[in-house]
Regions:
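Amphipathic alpha-helical hairpins
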Residues: 1-129
């Protein structure tokens, strides 16, 4: 089932070549990662800075995907790379505490899912270029 965001995005002329399900999955993963990182940042002081930065990056990535008109492929790739890097850093930090904290384990899982979703969008963009 296509969400309202996907329907709106599909109506944009620049989006005709994009697979809306891949974009929707990435936005969903970014939102889930943002939430998991926000929760983790309030629970574990050791990884709080990484979690807060990752939450901000995921939020920014999701918002950028909602307004892709005017965004060049190069800038979109740079945003995806930045989101992947932030998620990887946060995941690595949270994995150090994952055996002691369920919150950190769940945050690391959300970071991995977001990394995978951003990579899928990059792959789709490269295939359609």
């Amino acid at each position: 089932m296509m969400g309202a965001m996907s329907k709106n995005m599909e109506s944009m002329p620049d989006m005709a070549m994009m697979d809306m399900s891949v974009l929707q999955a990435c936005m969903d993963a970014c939102a889930a990662c943002e939430q998991a990182c926000t929760v983790c940042s309030t629970q574990m002081m050791d990884c709080a800075p990484a979690c807060m930065n990752c939450a901000d990056m995921c939020h920014t990535m999701m918002r950028s995907m909602l307004r892709m008109q005017g965004m060049t492929p190069a800038s979109m790739m740079a945003m995806l790379d930045a989101c992947i890097a932030m998620c990887q850093m946060c995941m690595d930090e949270c994995m150090e505490h994952a055996d002691m904290s369920e919150v950190c384990r769940l945050c690391a899982q959300a970071c991995q899912a977001c990394t995978d979703a951003c990579t899928a969008v990059k792959d789709m963009m490269m295939a359609s270029a």
